[in-house]
Amino acid sequence: MRLETVRQILDCRVLVGDDRLDGEVSLGCGADLMSDVLAFIKPNALLLTGLSNVQSVRTADIAGARAIVYVRGKLPDKEAIELAKETGIVLLATRFLMFEACGKLYAHGLRGGSELQEGFSDVGGAPLRSTV
């Protein structure tokens, strides 16, 4: 999904990278716990988070994420903005709650990492299976 499409769907404000909205993301990851992000995110992903400090940008950079959408109207601090400029990570902000933002993107075709992983399992190691 193009970042411009993400911007339109979530009615985002562009904070960093308005010249890179033609870039593509291949999946989404919504989390506030950066250890979860590091465990589950894949390169070229879109990170949705309410964590608005520099750690969100550091984590996205380490994980190879292309962009961050800050949810719930959160805005990153100056240090996070500067690091995003240095690393080339696009920063967007939306008023939507994380659940709503992820749902809107999913409804428009963006998928999460678990759908792209073979044999994805929970913490206990047993494969997740639908009971429906």
Task: Please give the residue ranges for each predicted region.
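N-terminal, charge-rich interaction modules
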Residues: M1-D19
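Catalytic, metal-anchored helix/loop core of enzyme active sites in primary metabolism
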Residues: L3-E4, K85-I89, V132
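Feature captures the catalytic cores and cofactor-binding loops of soluble hydro-lyases/lyases
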Residues: D22-G23, L27-L46, G50-F120
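Internal, active-site/partner-interface "lid" segment
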Residues: E115-V132
